[in-house]
UniProtKB/Swiss-Prot annotation:
Organism phylogeny: Bacteria, Pseudomonadati, Pseudomonadota, Alphaproteobacteria, Hyphomicrobiales
Function per UniProt: ATP-dependent specificity component of the Clp protease. It directs the protease to specific substrates. Can perform chaperone functions in the absence of ClpP.
Entry binding sites for ATP: P122, T123, G124, C125, G126, K127, T128, Y129
CDD domains cross-referenced by the UniProt entry: RecA-like_ClpX
Disulfide bonds: none
UniProt keyword Isomerase present: no
Protein name: ATP-dependent Clp protease ATP-binding subunit ClpX
Biological source species: Sinorhizobium fredii (strain NBRC 101917 / NGR234)
Residues at which Zn(2+) binds: C18, C21, C40, C43
Highest taxon of the lineage: Bacteria
GO annotation, biological process: cell division; proteolysis involved in protein catabolic process
Length: 425
């Protein structure tokens, strides 16, 4: 039951209090009234956090205690827009991987092999985000490595063992947990062989890294220095078995679509052949026809591709998909900026045509969803600079003219509801 102050002061006579935390209506931003109780915005937020955590742990699981593919894809849909085929491939691969681990202890005459995953798609289409979301769903340690920083052992740069060290750190040095984790190696297209022919000189950051990754991806006992690097020769090494670590590799593979198209042209020669200009097809559409031989042609060695049996290609994002990414996911960019403005007690509103204009600009930049934040920052920079010192603003409205740079955002004031500020840029 909410409390009412018994003070004789006129202002505090009918002060309402939150029934849960006891704070008064003056100490919180909002106080929501029920038939006999009151709850403040802070308690509502706390309740939502508790429910979110419980939902995460009470995920529907198969008999093996592993989330089902349908459950995995359902959660992925909440965070990642589009890419249905890639999400389906990933959810099945991850489900099978952890089901394999659940059965590993049981004696069986059939040994289940590990299926690492290769994600191929244009920049900004959600490869990294998919891998991060998967690790959150399964609740296992996750680490991300940049393939461009890796070199062969003995050369200046990061050893491949450093990847396992990062995973160990993500697992708080719990070796058992780390051995069930997920490793995402980004930019694998940058470690492609520099030439189609084997060279007499060593390619320490290209083919050399691919060779170094082979063993840890397939399964080996890696000796990991807890303090990293070679600067502490006296330290004791931790032994980490990589057999059950799921490796997901991703890359944009710029130019791979041309290799696929060239292979297709060879098989469609003659009077009855359908000839389509490469410009007529989107990159994602061409990538659907990807075969392992195309990756070999690109510069990955056959042994490396052999360790990545699951191939998932991602579509390049069109205008409608980018608009959805801006507004629909749980942590959509628009929702993030609206939350920032709420902290100033200001409502942030975007017109539909403004979202479309932002999406168009991201497509022109060719950076996919990654470019959306920088466009948003540019649009809202002046507003975020001015807002903390402005009095009485209750709403900021963004139109397509604001995105184009021909007008300033519309400020709506609470004390003078008719007064609006919209000065041409």
């Amino acid at each position: 039951m909410s409390k009412v102050s018994g003070s004789n002061g006129g202002d505090s006579k009918n002060t309402l209090y939150c029934s849960f935390c006891g704070k008064s209506q003056h100490e919180v931003r909002k106080l929501i009234a029920g038939p006999t109780v009151f709850i403040c915005d802070e308690c509502v937020e706390l309740c939502m956090d508790i429910i979110r955590e419980e939902n995460k742990t009470s995920m529907v699981k198969s008999r093996d205690g592993v989330p089902t593919p349908q459950e995995i894809i359902k959660v992925l849909d909440e965070y990642v827009i589009g890419q249905q085929q890639a999400k389906r491939i990933l959810s099945v691969a991850v489900h099978n991987h952890y089901k394999r681990l659940a059965h590993a202890a049981k004696s069986s005459d059939v040994e289940l092999a590990k299926s690492n995953i290769m994600l191929v798609g244009p920049t900004g289409c959600g490869k990294t985000y998919l891998a991060q979301t998967l690790a959150r769903i399964i609740d296992v340690p996750f680490t991300m490595a940049d393939a461009t920083t890796l070199t062969e052992a003995g050369y200046v740069g990061e050893d491949v063992e450093n990847i396992i060290l990062k995973l160990l750190q993500a697992a708080d040095y719990n070796v058992e947990r780390a051995q069930r984790g997920i490793v995402y190696i980004d930019e694998v297209d940058k470690i492609s062989r520099k030439s189609d022919n084997p060279s007499i000189t060593r390619d320490v950051s290209g083919e050399g890294v691919q060779q170094a990754l082979l063993k840890i991806m397939e399964g080996t006992v890696a000796s990991v220095p807890p303090q990293g690097g070679r600067k502490h020769p006296q330290q004791e090494f931790l032994q980490v078995d990589t057999t059950n670590i799921l490796f997901i590799c991703g890359g944009a593979f710029a130019g791979l679509d041309k290799i696929i198209s060239a292979r297709g042209e060879k098989t469609s020669i003659g009077f009855g052949a359908t000839v389509r200009s490469p410009e007529d097809r989107r990159v994602g559409e061409v990538l659907r026809e990807l075969e392992p031989e195309d990756l070999v042609k690109f510069g990955l060695i056959p042994e490396f591709i052999g360790r990545l049996p699951v191939l998932a290609t991602l579509e390049d994002l069109d205008e409608d998909a980018l608009i959805q990414i801006l507004s629909e996911p749980k942590n959509a960019l628009i929702k993030q900026y609206q939350r920032l403005f709420e902290m100033e007690d200001v409502e942030l509103t975007f017109h539909e045509d403004a979202l479309r204009e932002i999406a168009k600009r991201a497509i022109i930049r060719k950076t996919g969803a990654r470019g959306l934040r920088s466009i948003m920052e540019k649009i809202l920079l002046d507003t975020m600079f001015e807002l903390p010192t402005l009095e009485g603003v209750r709403e900021v409205v963004i139109s397509d003219e604001v995105v184009k740079g021909t007008a300033r955002p519309l400020y709506i004031y609470s004390d003078r509801s008719e007064e609006k500020t919209n000065v041409s840029a």
